[in-house]
């Protein structure tokens, strides 16, 4: 009897073991492999992951469509959506890769301007601290310009123009930061060269009034009263309501150069004639 009880117990466990194996195999067989799904089904899964907030999984599934069904009608859209999903996840390098492949494969597509815009944004969104290298800013500017020049009537041309202005402001801020450092440490010519870049290359940015004021400071420190006077005249003409105007006026209050500004030579004379007199030749 004891033997029979042991035998029954062992038989029960063996039976249970095989049942578990059978259930596991059945479960595995019911799981559909990705390769068994159509492009449309994979796209639906990817879109659901995207909508649910799992952009990483969504990007993987979108790229699976490109891998499994490269010639399907959804491959093109999936490739672009992978760039969008990766951008959301701040995986900018991978996002650029997907967008660049889209441009290579579909250069004349209606969504190609958007692919360029994603590339530009991937650079632009990495612009942060003014103390860092500005290579990213220049890459963003280059791609935004491509959009404006090649696709001026696209919906991305106007936001690209706005982003260019903001990028210019960022570059001007970088020049101002370096220029102030040189000015503070009495490296006047080095400071002048930095402020000159702001006035000549980024004249529409918010930093131009201060750049002109700092030029007045630097030129007066070097005893170059003519240059200081012209810098002040440009500031007074264009930015009289600026917070820098009164400080500049006070600096130049006791300066009497007897200068005929209209005949002044050099880069400041050119700027003066262009800005105030409207002579662009």
Give the location of each predicted region.
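Bacterial N-terminal signal peptides
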Residues: 13-22
């Amino acid at each position: 009897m004891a033997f029979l009880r042991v035998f029954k117990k062992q038989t029960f466990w063996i039976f249970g073991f095989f049942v578990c194996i059978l259930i596991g195999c059945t479960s595995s067989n019911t799981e559909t492999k990705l390769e068994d799904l159509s492009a449309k089904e994979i796209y639906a899964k990817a879109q659901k992951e995207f909508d649910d907030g799992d952009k990483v999984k969504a990007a993987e599934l979108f790229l699976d469509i490109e891998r499994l069904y490269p010639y399907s009608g959804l491959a093109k859209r999936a490739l672009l959506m992978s760039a969008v999903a990766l951008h959301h996840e701040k995986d900018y390098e991978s996002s650029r890769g997907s967008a660049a492949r889209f441009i290579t494969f579909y250069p004349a597509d209606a969504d190609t301007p958007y692919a360029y815009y994603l590339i530009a944004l991937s650079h632009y969104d990495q612009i942060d601290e003014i103390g860092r290298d500005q290579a990213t800013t220049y890459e963003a500017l280059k791609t935004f310009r491509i959009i404006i020049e090649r696709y001026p009537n696209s919906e991305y041309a106007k936001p690209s123009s706005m982003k260019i202005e903001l990028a210019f402001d960022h570059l001007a801020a970088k020049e101002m930061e370096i220029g102030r450092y040189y000015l503070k440490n009495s490296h006047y010519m080095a400071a002048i060269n930095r402020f000159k870049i702001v006035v000549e290359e980024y004249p529409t940015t918010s930093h131009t009034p201060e750049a002109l004021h700092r030029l007045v400071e630097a030129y007066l420190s070097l005893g170059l009263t003519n240059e200081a006077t012209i810098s002040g005249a440009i500031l007074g003409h264009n930015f009289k309501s600026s917070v820098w105007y009164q400080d500049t006026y006070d600096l130049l209050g006791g300066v009497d150069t007897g200068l005929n500004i209209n005949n002044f030579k050099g880069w400041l004379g050119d700027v003066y004639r262009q800005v105030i007199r409207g002579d662009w030749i």
